[in-house]
């Protein structure tokens, strides 16, 4: 599986996920600088106030 892994509004980059990982994620939250976005492999659990979207196809988390 190939997932996007750039932070917030940086130029898109991708990474190959290891260990048979089948999910990509896009996590979004707000801090004093505005909205922040994190992308990567997996589907981590998140705290309240953090929005997360998980998906299962190549580059689906941009």
Curated annotation (Swiss-Prot):
It is found in: Secreted. CDD domains: TFP_snake_toxin. Keywords: Acetylcholine receptor inhibiting toxin, Disulfide bond, Ion channel impairing toxin, Neurotoxin, Postsynaptic neurotoxin, Secreted, Toxin. Expressed by the venom gland. InterPro entries: Snake_3FTx, Snake_toxin-like_sf, Snake_toxin_con_site, Toxin_cobra-type. One of its GO terms (cellular component) is extracellular region. Residues 1-16 have a biased composition (Polar residues). The keyword Transferase does not apply. Disulfide bonds join 3-24, 17-41, 43-54, 55-60. Pfam families: Toxin_cobra-type. GO terms for molecular function: acetylcholine receptor inhibitor activity; ion channel regulator activity; toxin activity. Signal peptide: none annotated. Residues 1-22 are annotated as: Disordered. The keyword Secreted applies. It comes from the Eukaryota. Binds to muscle nicotinic acetylcholine receptor (nAChR) and inhibit acetylcholine from binding to the receptor, thereby impairing neuromuscular transmission. Belongs to the three-finger toxin family. Short-chain subfamily. Type I alpha-neurotoxin sub-subfamily. This is Neurotoxin 3. It comes from Naja sputatrix. The lineage of its organism: Eukaryota, Metazoa, Chordata, Craniata, Vertebrata.
